[in-house]
A protein has these predicted regions:
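RecA-like P-loop NTPase motor core of helicase/translocase proteins
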Residues: 1-141
Length: 141
């Protein structure tokens, strides 16, 4: 059985909110295996290697507050930890949204490293099934 996926406005809004946090970020053209030494120094911190964030905290705060205004959320000033949350109800397509967000972050900004944490083996297996089911859809997007 082949599933058909339909764009949902709330899912597109969630992806847009996450991606727009990084507005102004230059696209980094790199891969995990082939990097210039100059690029590696941009990615390294005390935790290891990650995506090179080239926008400053002030710009990220402006971006975050713009997203908050767009969705009528209370404005906050705390981006010190750079932890952002998109809350979605059960069975609303969270896996679809974060997969779409990952692909869009890669397309726009060249981000290539993502960590997805799930609370149990059962949910991990559900995520794997969802990724398998959406593989064709996202490869055509």
């Amino acid at each position: 059985m082949k599933l058909k996926f339909k764009k949902q406005a709330y899912q597109t809004d969630a992806t847009s909110a996450a991606v727009n946090l990084f507005a102004g970020q230059e696209k980094i053209a790199s891969t995990f295996t082939v990097m210039e030494e100059r690029q590696l120094s941009l990615l390294q911190n005390e935790y290891g290697y990650g995506n090179a964030l080239l926008i400053d905290d002030k710009k990220m705060l402006e971006n975050m507050q713009e997203v908050q205004r767009r969705f009528n959320l209370p404005l906050t000033n705390d981006i010190e930890d750079k932890r952002f949350c998109i809350d979605m109800e059960t069975a609303t397509g969270k896996t679809f949204v974060y997969t779409q967000t990952i692909l869009e972050l890669n397309r726009r900004y060249g981000f290539t490293k993502f960590i997805v944490v799930v609370p149990s083996v059962a949910i991990r297996e559900g995520v794997k099934k969802s990724l398998d089911a959406t593989k064709e859809y996202f490869s055509q997007a």
